[in-house]
Structure formats: C-alpha cells, structure tokens
Amino acid sequence: MRITPASRENAKQFDTVFAITEAVMGFVPNSMLIMARDPALLAAFSELSALIVIRPGRLDPGLKALIMYMVSRSAGCQYCAAHSANLAALRDVATHKIEALGQFEQSLEFSEAERAALRFAQAAGQVPNAVGNTEFAELRRHFDDDQILEMVAVLALLGFLNRWNDALATPLEEGPRNFAECHLTGIGWKAGKHLDTIPLNPHPRRSIPLRAQLFLWLLRRWRPRPRPSKYNSFPGATP
C-alpha cells in the first residue's frame, strides 16, 4: 500500500456515492477510498464516472465493460483489468467469452463489430496512442459517430484510472481478484503489486439510502433521445 485510504467513517459526505457504487459493483473500490482523501477530486470523479459508465447510453453495457478491460490490459493495469472483467460478468457477459478476450481476433465468441471495438480499445491503451485512420474506418462500419464518442469517453476515463491505480499499486479487492484468478490467469493476468493482504475495505455492505435508490432508478430508466441513423439496427443502438 503506497498511500493510506480514507476510512468511510471520515468520508460520510460520500455515503450516497458509496451506496450507488456498491449497488453497481458489489463493493466500494479501494481506489475510491484513496481518492476520498481529496473530497473535491472524488466528487468530480464520481459524477464523471456515473455519467460515462453507469448512465445508459447507445452502446451495449456489456460491450462497454469489455472495452474497459481491453484498454486496461493494453495499458498494463492489472487492477482495472480485473475490475472491468468482473463488471462484464455482472452485466451478463458469459464467462467463456471473457476468457476468450485474449484471442478475440480469432474467437467465434465475438462479432465483427465487437472485434472492431476491442481492436480500437487495444490501440488506444498503448503509449503512444496507436489509434489511426484504419481503426476509425473499421469502427464506422459498425457504429455511428455518437456511439464512437461514447466509446472514446469510456476509454479516456479508463486512461485516468489505469494510471491512478498502477502508480498507486492499489490493493485489489477480494471479489474482482477471485474472478480474475478464476477467469483471466489463462490470458496472462497476474495480481502482481495489487496483491495486498491489508484489508482496506473491511466495512459490511450497508443499506442503500433512499436518495441513492432514486438516483439508480432514474439512471436505469433514462434513455437518450433516439436519432435517425442507418446504424439503429445494431444491438448497441437505442431502438
């Protein structure tokens, strides 16, 4: 552990944020507890991440989680890779499909659209960024500009998280660690520096405050206004 996280008792102003996070992920990430040392930073991050990751958009939620995994894997952040793969499973992506991510170019588990998105995420995670006109042209065969913009927002958010968690060697929580050990070790995943036995998040799961329940209810029912597009037949698009 490189920086001691804030305790939830000393971050009461984020009770609603933590409750929403628990409802979505099943736990409060140690990365957020470390971020809570700077309340203004966590407040801004929580709002942005809810907008990009939780709010329903025009991309399939499972595909979002898969590209989160791929950009994290490409950037070398094992913490975020474990989180993203675990989130994909929570969003009903089959575990055998997650296990096939290391061979997504050849695997029959993935559609051509998914391969294009994963290829794009893989290139975006490299330093320097390896996204070129070829990757964009391939994306446009399957996604419209608004869907691509949503995808880039996800990748940009993960760029911040990859560097945050890799630089801090954030200890990986039990849930995503167990999932990664079961399903990602075959494609090269290792906990490495994120394996810390100090219980940073020992708090029992708390009941969700009414305000947080209302926020989640609104998020799950919000849909952007549909726009006429030749891509509206794609499963990730809003009907």
Briefly describe each language-model feature range.
Residues 1-239:
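Hydrophobic alpha-helical segments
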